[in-house]
Every structure is written in structure tokens, then in C-alpha cells.
Amino acid sequence: MQVVRQEYPEAEVLMGTSTAGIPHAAIVAQMMGLPMGYVRGSGKDHGRKNQIEGRLEPGQKVVVIEDLISTGGSVLDVVSVLREAGAEVLGVASIFTYGMQKGLSRLAKANVKNRSLTNFDVIAAVAAEQKYIQPEDVARLIRFRDNPEDESWIGGEK
């Protein structure tokens, strides 16, 4: 809630991403006294065939609530749907980001501000400090984050 208040004080509506962002958006919206909705990955195949659920008026200032950002693809799809509906998307608030270069670049190119509660570097450092993972595991995870298409990190090769 603090991130949304501080980074997006003019927010009028919170929109969760389907499915994992919905409960987080609901909680934050309730705490802030804001309306909330969510965006499906695609329109329903019955009823009104809505992709956006919840009341959204053209021109309203929206913050998208997401659980995790990796490459940015799914959250950018949501932003696109909202913009097409006439919303002014102020940005995205997520719980976690890997900080993958591909995701950061895509968000920047789409002019989408992103604020996360935590990130890969913090989680990896705390996990290593608390001895949940070993230093070599951190190195492997960094290789994944920096180049997810290269699966050599899985086998533990250095």
C-alpha cells in the first residue's frame, strides 16, 4: 500500500493481473479505499466476453498490481488492454521483480513505471546470508536471471 501511495498518489483505480495479482490488488484497494478490478489474459468466451472486470472509465488513472515481473510480457499485455480502454496507466506495483534486462527494457520502451517491494538481488543475498542457499547457488541463479534462455545453470555447471 505504501508503494502505491508514495509512487502513484494520484491513483484512482487499482487493476490486478489475472490471476495472481487479483488478491493483492483487492487488499491494497480496500486499505486505500479505491475501486478495484482485474484484467484477464483474454476475453471470456461467454457472457459479455469482458477482458476487463470492474468499473473503469476512460481517463481514469490506474495502477496495475502484479505479483512477479520477469520479462514484462504479461504485465505489458495488461497495460495495453487498459490503455486501449482509455485508462491512463500510471505504472505497475509488483511484489517481486527478477530485474531481468529484457523486462526492464520492455517496460522502459513502453513508458511504464515499475516499482517492486523486493527484487532478486535482495532475496538471493538474504537467502545466502541465512544459509538457505550456498554461494554457488547464488551464482547459478544470477546466471539464470542474466540469461534465462541458457539452461546451463540448471545442471550446476560453472
Residue spans for each PLM region:
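Portal/gating segments that form or line small-molecule/metal binding sites
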Residues: I22
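PRPP-dependent phosphoribosyltransferase catalytic core
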Residues: S80-K158
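Nucleotide/phosphate-binding catalytic cleft detector across ATP-hydrolyzing
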Residues: E7, Q30, R145
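Short, glycine/charge-rich flexible loops or terminal/linker lids adjacent to PRPP-binding catalytic cores
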Residues: A25-V63, T71-D77
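A contiguous pocket-lining binding segment that forms or flanks enzyme active sites
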Residues: R55-G99
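Active-site-facing substrate-recognition patch
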Residues: M1-E10
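Short glycine-rich phosphate-binding loop at a beta-alpha junction
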Residues: P9-S18, A93
